[in-house]
Amino acid sequence: MTPTLSILIPCFDYDCSKLVADLQRKGDEEGLSLEIIVGDDTLTRLGRARNRNRLAEQASGEWLLIVDCDAAMPPAFSLRKYVEAGRQAPVVCGGLYHPDVNPCPEATLRFKYERKADLRRAARFRQEHPYAQLSTFSLLVRRETFLAIRFDEACVEYGYEDTLFGAELERRGIPILHIDNPLIHMGLEPDAIFLAKTETAMRTLHRLEQKLRGHSHLLATVDRLRRLHLCGLIRCCWRLCRKPLRANLLGKHPSLFLFSVYKLGFFLCLR
């Protein structure tokens, strides 16, 4: 029997057994036939985009529900709500939020960053800019739609595969419906790891700059600075201030403004 949903969980060295059990239990409660496929990329090293594409190829359901491995399921979450929303659009984004209490004491910067972002993660905000706000943390896609687009396999490392997927949906005129059916993001890494992943994302953005032009606020800022011939000055200032910037971001009271400055300076110094 073909499952109602194929739930795809891309994973890298993370125990998602509780998430799998919770999703299966929810499916049983709601009378849904599920197929749950976990793609652990720890040994295969396919990369983020290729791993997700392979999971979609393996799936047999008409609908794919992509869920990040570090998600937790709140009581209000409903798989059936996704199924019903799928009758209105081929792509449905359920959203995410973070716990009220920081689950990782070493993740002060990340927790502060995400909690601020949570303020505009309700569906009514996301639907204002549906493609720019696409997140594959919890995303329902019709299988034939996904396989026609796929994730861009140029995204091997961390960052921007969601952005490219959303941009391609927009280019093809495929509608996205945003709903309030969030999962909880529990996998906050220590700030040193988060900062390293941010630097990796900036390298990805730099490498894929032409593909991402028009889909990145940071690139729009860079373009304005280039027109004003200010990039050289900012590079110089960033190199002088890099150590104190990092000290703030890895400290007890990190500044989100300085985090934005750090990302901009790091990007401009890439060659």
Predicted stretch roles:
Residues 1-25:
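N-proximal low-complexity "stem/linker" segments adjacent to membrane-targeting elements
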Residues 200-203, 217-271:
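Non-catalytic, C-terminal membrane-associated alpha-helical segments of glycosyltransferases
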